[in-house]
Amino acid sequence: KYITDQILVMYLGNMMEYGDTDEIFDNPLHPYTKALFSAVPVPNPDAKMERIILSGDIPSPANPPKGCKFHTRCKECMSVCKMLEPKYIEHTKNHFVACHLYNEEVMNNLAKYDEELKREEHEAAVKKALEEEMLKDKNWFQKWMIKRKK
């Protein structure tokens, strides 16, 4: 806090939050920034700090997830987070955050993203089921060709 004028918080090589040091410390917006700050030890043993414990899968930097890179560990995760990478929003002067929670356009269209995610999940489940069937039956292609000829 006393070393720099500005802070940039990154996760898997992506900017999550950026701004003036005092603003970020006083008003962290991104769930990852909040979790980081909650892990900072406080020298006062009487001070009660609420720790944010991150759970969920830590994604591979070589194969990051679709959408927000933090969604696999975020307690605020919504369907849109799994689909779209968030835009950088200037929440207040010189305080930028990449989180759908602060994007009015996205927040006003959550139902659309919920439906789209359900459709994508259904399609993925059907594809997985077909692949499992094909693995069970090594002769699936021959059977498919015979059925097709009939």
Identify the meaning behind each predicted range.
Residues 10:
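Catalytic metal- and UDP-sugar-binding loop of GT-A-like glycosyltransferases, i.e.
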Residues 1-2:
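A short, surface-exposed alpha-helical micro-motif characterized by mixed small hydrophobic
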Residues 21-123:
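Charged, flexible cofactor/metal-binding loops and thiol motifs
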